[in-house]
């Protein structure tokens, strides 16, 4: 679980990266689709899954908007992300293993875009936070 120190580190990092959330989301989602091509199946209704395509940009923005909600609900991720969990489980039917894949891509993008802010402590805290988000999103699958 997230310690107070982790929560503070996530909030501090988010305050620095939040303005670039759309670019982070686009790059992370584009990266996921290229590096893990099996994830393309969730986006087969799009005309293209080429990195940077407007649909990828729009969904990357949605993903990062969801993470912004998670940061604001950091003290109770399960309750804060309940609606998103329901949507991903029942409407979108996303395999929860893909949350971990996207989390990894988000970490990679943040580390390359914000190397000075992505300290080892920020990395640990953000990784724990993203793992908590993945668990909260997977809660409706049980």
From Swiss-Prot:
Give the sites modified to N-acetylserine: 1
Tissue and organ distribution: Red blood cells.
GO BP of this protein: hydrogen peroxide catabolic process
Keyword Chloroplast, does the record have it?
no
InterPro entries hit by this protein: Globin, Globin-like_sf, Globin/Proto, Hemoglobin_a-typ, Hemoglobin_oxygen_transport, Hemoglobin_pi
Instruction: List the coiled-coil residues.
Output: none
Give the keywords, sorted.
Acetylation, Heme, Iron, Metal-binding, Oxygen transport, Transport
Q: Where in the numbering of this chain does the Globin domain appear?
A: 1-142
Q: Which domain of life is it from?
A: Eukaryota
Name any one Pfam family assigned in the record. Globin
Q: Which PROSITE patterns match?
A: GLOBIN
Q: Which GO terms describe its cellular component?
A: blood microparticle; haptoglobin-hemoglobin complex; hemoglobin complex
The residues that hold O2 are 59
Q: Which Gene3D superfamilies match?
A: Globins
GO terms (molecular function) for this protein are:
haptoglobin binding; heme binding; iron ion binding; organic acid binding; oxygen binding; oxygen carrier activity; peroxidase activity
Statement: the UniProt record of this protein carries the keyword Repeat? no
What does the entry list as the binding residues for heme b?
88
The family note in this entry says: Belongs to the globin family.
Q: What else is known?
A: This fish has two hemoglobins: Hb1 and Hb2.
Purpose: Involved in oxygen transport from gills to the various peripheral tissues.
Q: How does it assemble?
A: Hb1 is a heterotetramer of two alpha-2 chains and two beta chains.
Check the record and name the PANTHER family matching this protein: HEMOGLOBIN FAMILY MEMBER, HEMOGLOBIN SUBUNIT ZETA
This protein's name: Hemoglobin subunit alpha-1
Species name: Notothenia neglecta (Yellowbelly rockcod)
């Amino acid at each position: 679980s997230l310690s107070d120190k982790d929560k503070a580190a996530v909030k501090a990092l988010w305050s620095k990266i939040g303005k670039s959330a759309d670019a982070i989301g686009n790059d992370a989602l584009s990266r996921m689709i290229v590096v893990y091509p099996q994830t393309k199946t969730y986006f087969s209704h799009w005309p293209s899954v080429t990195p940077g395509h407007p649909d990828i940009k729009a969904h990357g923005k949605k993903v990062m908007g969801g993470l912004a909600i998670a940061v604001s609900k950091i003290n109770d991720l399960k309750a804060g992300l309940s609606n998103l969990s329901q949507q991903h489980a029942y409407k979108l039917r996303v395999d929860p293993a893909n949350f971990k894949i996207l989390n990894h891509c988000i970490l990679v993008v943040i580390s390359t875009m914000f190397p000075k802010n992505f300290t080892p402590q920020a990395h640990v805290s953000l990784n724990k936070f993203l793992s908590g988000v993945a668990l909260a999103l997977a809660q409706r699958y049980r």
